[in-house]
Amino acid sequence: MVFMDKMKLAAKNADSKAGEAVDKSKYKSKIYEEENEIKKLYSKIGEAYYTAKAEGKDASADLDAMVKEIDDRKAKIVEYEVKIKEIEEAGQKEREQNKAEAEAAAKAREEAKAAKEAEKSEE
């Protein structure tokens, strides 16, 4: 590949990686938010359990609801992690495609140049 081809490829790949980083950061932020909410729920579970025991009440329904919410939030985290993996894979494919296109363009230019030189030598 010629220097300019390499520069174009580097620019395309940098753009690809930047877009990938932005998309991944959105999901990482969502994961962080879910993890914080889970921590709050753990605290609420402890408080609800203590209060129920201290007052001699049954907190099963409240605790079950909070446990379900934690499970739901953990499921969201898994979904977000899958999305991040998909973004990484798509970015990698895009960069591989960029490289293949750049190599094909360079090869086509080299073949055209060789054909032109062959034409000149025949004259």
Residue spans for each PLM region:
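Short, charge/polar-rich alpha-helical segments
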Residues: 17-36
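Alpha-helix N-cap/helix-start motif at coil-to-helix transitions, marked by capping-box chemistry
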Residues: 1, 5, 35-43
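Short, charge-rich amphipathic alpha-helices with coiled-coil/heptad character
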Residues: 3-23
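Amphipathic alpha-helix face/heptad-repeat signature
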Residues: 30, 34, 66-69, 73
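Short E/K-rich amphipathic alpha-helical oligomerization segments
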Residues: 39-67, 71
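Amphipathic alpha-helical coiled-coil segments
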Residues: 69-88
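Long, low-complexity, compositionally biased polyampholytic IDRs enriched for Lys/Glu and Gln/Arg
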Residues: 86-119
